[in-house]
Swiss-Prot record:
Protein name: Endoglucanase B
One GO BP annotation of this record: cellulose catabolic process
Species, as recorded: Evansella cellulosilytica (strain ATCC 21833 / DSM 2522 / FERM P-1141 / JCM 9156 / N-4) (Bacillus cellulosilyticus)
Family recorded in the similarity comment: Belongs to the glycosyl hydrolase 5 (cellulase A) family.
Biased composition (Pro residues): 334-343
Taxonomic superkingdom: Bacteria
Protein's gene: celB
Source organism phylogeny: Bacteria, Bacillati, Bacillota, Bacilli, Bacillales
Amino acid sequence: MKKITTIFVVLLMTLALFIIGNTTAADDYSVVEEHGQLSISNGELVNDRGEPVQLKGMSSHGLQWYGQFVNYESMKWLRDDWGITVFRAAMYTSSGGYIEDPSVKEKVKEAVEAAIDLGIYVIIDWHILSDNDPNIYKEEAKDFFDEMSELYGDYPNVIYEIANEPNGSDVTWDNQIKPYAEEVIPVIRNNDPNNIIIVGTGTWSQDVHHAADNQLTDPNVMYAFHFYAGTHGQNLRDQVDYALDQGAAIFVSEWGTSEATGDGGVFLDEAQVWIDFMDERNLSWANWSLTHKDESSAALMPGASPTGGWTEAELSPSGTFVREKIRESATTPPSDPTPPSDPDPGEPEPDPGEPDPTPPSDPGDYPAWDPNTIYTDEIVYHNGQLWQAKWWTQNQEPGDPYGPWEPLN
């Protein structure tokens, strides 16, 4: 009897060690350890052995509004449950972002350091949008990327995106975007000679064909391409194919299942066409966006935890679709991690990243509406009233009940 008991105990210990060993192996898996230093070869993203790499992951929303969703716990959940291999930290420059509040870069640092600890790649995104010409804040961009590349240039995890979405008919690749990149890239290369740099292209990073005709000389540059499945279709896929034929390396650093406004839809059939297109061409991508904002491109439902552990009910239709697509191609099958504990489930989570909808007593604190300015979610003063943009708009006067402006007082 004693012998049988001893054998049983040994078997139990062996089984326990096997389970622990497998769990540790899954938790310790690092896509960065697997692929190492990324580079460009023949217009394609490759690992340190020269093998093609396709990264898939999520982009944050604006860190100044929804930064509470960008933290070690949420990124770990995305790695372990979704299977992401890249995370994009979207630091708006205007709209209450870095130019007005430089402290938002601390959230970028938090994202980068979490990604390093978790062994995934991370995109540091200089998110120009309403400031449509990257040259508007060129000097600030140079200072910012000098700091980031000095801090993190030794880590192969890091990817720099130096101009999210240049836009406007007077902002072209040849005259504005490429000259800007030719000033910012050397600042990064002074500290970081190797890591990938993504450069935005014209018309909200759609005009990759123009960049392909006049490429930058840095060997490890990629060109940003963005699309929204409910708005963009075959004509833009043709532009990507043209750019690839010219040997340009393309990174889809932002895409959504919605219309280009970030809302409307979702368009899952159209999104699947795009997913297939990107897979067939081995294009890396980051989906917009990790937030609980009440818009269809958001991955989470209102009220979702900012630290991961999301149930199916907490995922939006877009989030459910994107999670499934990432999990389908994960190098290591994602585990089913234990949701992080909530120390006080009765208390609602704070939402410090969202703008305060309550206007100040003095409307003069906000600028007057300007028909020539591009707005995305800014607050303006017009006809004795404060208004906030609900989506991208230009030359649409506040006051139209079906328009993009919402009254605040």
